[in-house]
């Protein structure tokens, strides 16, 4: 798939932003700190909004999310609520370092139960607190801290993975353009207490109908054991995730 070099640069810049900036930016900030040590760097919103989750055309839930670049890290917060208006909800809170390594991940639900994931001795460990349990249980994963987290139902995690793929996918220059190959990732699914391999592939530009209006978006495919998803990003608006299609489940996720 051809991927224009200018587009590639934009994606790399986007990933640099979400990972708290390049070394040059940090060096500049350090020099500036010498002049004004008491002034902290302002937080920067990378993306925020909501995704509507539809099954067979009917809205069943809404995910609201916020991605913020803070000093030395990026925080990704999300909340999932049922469309029926009930009190049931889930929350996730993830923090990654400037080198794309997981610092912490936390999940909880209103009905009780929570979990956390954190690095320990160069690998990842998960701590699970089940409703009514006397004490939490722990599970170790022989995965590096740079492993992406793709937890159930939080689609903003797929947006972050798409940004990472577009920035690091194996590519080669051809006549001023880049042809990108698929990339494989080992990801962690905390709610399932499991890990799995996934592959992301750049398909290219497609015309997609979003709420009755036709838009040209950048399509990527996400494939894993037993699932195939299509993702569409707006390469004219910071590569924001606009839509996900999960045909096997009659499910669509659309940005509000």
How should each PLM-predicted stretch be described?
Residues 7-12:
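N-terminal export leaders
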Residues 30-132, 167-256:
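Acidic, serine/threonine-rich low-complexity disordered tracts
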Residues 24-28:
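Sec/Tat signal peptide C-region and signal peptidase I cleavage site
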Residues 2-6:
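Short, Lys/Arg-rich N-terminal segment immediately upstream of the first membrane anchor
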Residues 13-22:
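Bacterial N-terminal signal peptides
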Residues 128-154:
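Acidic/charged, solvent-exposed loop-and-adjacent secondary-structure segments enriched in E/D, K/R, S/T
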Residues 144-180:
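Beta-strand/loop-rich accessory regions of lumenal/periplasmic or secreted enzymes
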């Amino acid at each position: 798939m051809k991927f224009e070099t200018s587009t590639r640069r934009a994606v790399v810049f986007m990933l640099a932003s979400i990972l708290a900036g390049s070394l040059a930016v940090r060096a500049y900030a350090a020099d500036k700190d010498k002049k004004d040590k008491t002034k902290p760097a302002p937080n920067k919103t990378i993306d925020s909004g909501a995704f509507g989750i539809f099954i067979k055309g009917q809205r069943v839930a809404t995910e609201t999310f916020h991605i913020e670049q803070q000093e030395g890290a990026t925080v990704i917060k999300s909340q999932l609520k049922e469309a029926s208006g009930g009190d049931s909800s889930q929350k996730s809170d993830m923090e990654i370092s400037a080198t794309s390594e997981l610092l912490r991940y936390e999940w909880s639900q209103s009905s009780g139960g929570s979990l956390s994931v954190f690095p320990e001795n160069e690998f990842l460990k998960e701590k699970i607190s089940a409703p009514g349990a006397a004490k939490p249980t722990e599970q170790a994963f022989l995965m590096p801290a740079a492993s992406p987290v793709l937890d159930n139902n939080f689609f903003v995690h797929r947006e972050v993975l798409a940004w990472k793929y577009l920035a690091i996918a194996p590519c080669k220059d051809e006549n001023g353009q880049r042809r990108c190959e698929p990339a494989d990732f080992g990801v962690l699914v905390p709610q399932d207490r499991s890990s799995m391999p996934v592959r992301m592939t750049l398909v290219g530009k497609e015309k997609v109908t979003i709420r009755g209006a036709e838009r040209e978006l950048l399509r990527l495919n996400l494939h894993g054991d037993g699932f195939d998803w299509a993702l569409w990003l707006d390469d004219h608006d910071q590569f924001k995730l606009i839509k996900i299609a999960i045909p096997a489940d009659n499910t669509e996720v659309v940005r509000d």
